[in-house]
Amino acid sequence: MNARLLLDERHVIDDDAFVEIVIWLLSSPLAGSPHRLKYRLALVVHGDCVLRFDNEAGKGDHKHIGKKEIPYTFISSQVLLNDFWNEVDKWRH
């Protein structure tokens, strides 16, 4: 499967927290996802991933808040980024 990296960013939030965003464009959708993006957006605090949006093959689009996994309705890459940053803001406040 061919893939093209669209976004690979790391944002330091503070001394003990960072955000990592990786988005790939695939030649065909992953099993469980209707779109051609493969993504992982994560908030890591004190070395622990406390928030993550991803779409691993077979599971489809979902998010992890703490240890809880919740289905996520993917609309577009921009909405995905907005939703993720909104969750990061909630986590931090």
Question: Where would I find each of the regions flagged by the language model?
Answer:
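The feature represents the first ordered module of a protein
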Residues: 1-62
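Short, compact, well-ordered microdomains
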Residues: 68-93
